Amino acid sequence: YYITNVMEDYTPDMDQMLFYLPLAGSTFKKVYFDEVMGQAVSKFVPAEQLIVPYDTSDLDTCPNVTHIIRMGLNDLRKQQLAGVYRDINVIPVQGDVTEVQGEINRISGMEPSQIDYDCTLLECHVDLDLKGFEEVDDEGEPTGVKLPYVVTISQDNGQILSIRRNYK
């Protein structure tokens, strides 16, 4: 019920992902709770927007996964006001089109606009042992075990926008 009636973008997004699959060979879905919309959303993530170590065989045991997120400044501002990201000034930098993205644009008949108002965020899913937030044993001593976090960094200025636990 939820996917077909509440998540209105699910079907068009899934269609886009399935259309893209033969072109790229791999595609991904990201399901998360959107604070601004107040509901769970499911988004298509192209393979070229996901960075993993070369020898990764699956995402569950991967030590780090980075999702490259292109976001409009207005959407970023909404997320900042909702408390998802730190309220800092992010000035977008006009990015170069990669060779892969250029070929995808050519195949799909798209032309990039001359003005790019988007900012680029790097959402890193990593295991960290942060001082003051360590895992502790029964005696209260740090164990040295790294805990899962999601760290979001602005690629445009290199500043950290958020660090939050990624509970498993």
Language-model features: locations:
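Extended alpha-helical, oligomerization-prone segments that build pores/tubes and scaffolds
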Residues: 1-168
